[in-house]
């Protein structure tokens, strides 16, 4: 009897450990920016390092690819994180196939994250009224200049103040309002109803911009989808060196792991400040 009980306890522990290990897939698309700006490959490597070396959330794994992921990589992912010049699924060869792959991933509850310019969609990517699957999967997007249904804007601000949203949400744990020199996109697109976010979308952070005509702009958001999947979009960082900012790094890591259905610590996801040079950027400083 006691032997059977012991085996049962071990099985429960083993099962719990299995369910605790989640996998994050980073997909890096094309990039045309100069050294120190965007640096999507280095940024993905840095985030992978953080996820695999978290002191209080152990066992999680991550992978970085710079081409469209194969079926095995897609199937393994609990969430997929995109970096690059606009939404990589539309930039890699055979966008229709890529979007179909993502549709299947989303249907099974996979998460999706886009960082900075990967939140962007071009005029040719969307319908004349702005329809695109990313709007439902992630809750909003950056409408690239040239779009006809809506136009977002990109501008570097020397002192952009990033203010946490008012909602109580796990992604808001462990970081506070901060000021940063970056390019937090404004007038992002959330849908055809006066650009108001859908009911299942939470605005996570805002920034009052531009200085000469301030308006509170949503710069990060998340969605809890009906398919049980989750999405997270944040329109920073433009500068690679900003990954050294503790509050920004916690904010982004919170968002990524939340979309992978990982329970976040009350103090947020804390990754010690990494050595930015070690992840192979063309430059740490923009030039």
Model-derived regions: residue spans:
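Helical hinge/lid and interdomain linker segments adjacent to catalytic or ligand-binding clefts
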Residues: 25-27, 31-122
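Extracellular ligand-binding/catalytic regions of CAZymes and related secreted enzymes
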Residues: 28, 46-49, 75, 210-218, ...
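Bacterial N-terminal signal peptides
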Residues: 5-17
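N-terminal secretory signal peptides that target proteins for export/translocation
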Residues: 1-3
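A glycine-rich, often tryptophan-bearing local segment used as a flexible ligand/cofactor-contacting loop or short
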Residues: 27, 87-174
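Boundary at the C-terminal end of the N-terminal hydrophobic targeting segment
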Residues: 19-21
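Catalytic beta-strand/loop cores that center a nucleophilic Ser/Cys/Thr
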Residues: 149-228
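Active-site rim elements
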Residues: 32-33, 155-159, 176, 209, ...
